[in-house]
């Protein structure tokens, strides 16, 4: 799922064979109102995207809603909110917000996630978070 119609179209082209075989589907949607029923996914991933999610906690509640019990949510960011150089991106890109690990963990806990594990590359300011429903 992607918010961008352009990204969805490109992903559909790139994954045409897998889509035809029924191995995946690519849909346009908004993470604050995920267009899928409750408890349908084992895994949800967010690569370089939570920066742009409107109302982070609400979006995390939505991810939690569509995950099965015991499901996994993976967040990967190349910015961990501790690098002053990242300020250039938030000035250039309207609506972009870079979160620290602590901010993401707090929002995940509020949304009902447990067993939250954080992995970081402090040299490059990268973070990955794995949370279980």
Predicted regions and their residues:
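Class I SAM-dependent methyltransferase SAM/SAH-binding core
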Residues: 1-33
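Ligand-binding pocket scaffold of soluble enzyme catalytic domains
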Residues: 7-10, 14, 75, 83, ...
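Conserved Rossmann-like nucleotide-binding pocket used by diverse enzymes
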Residues: 27, 45, 74
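A short acidic, Gly/Pro-enriched loop at the edge of an enzyme's catalytic core
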Residues: 32-44
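A short SAM/SAH-binding and catalytic strip from SAM-dependent methyltransferases
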Residues: 43-56
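A short glycine-rich, Lys/Arg-flanked "PGG" loop and its adjoining helix->strand segment in the class I
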Residues: 57-72
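Conserved class I S-adenosyl-L-methionine
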Residues: 72-103
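Core SAM-dependent methyltransferase catalytic element
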Residues: 111-133
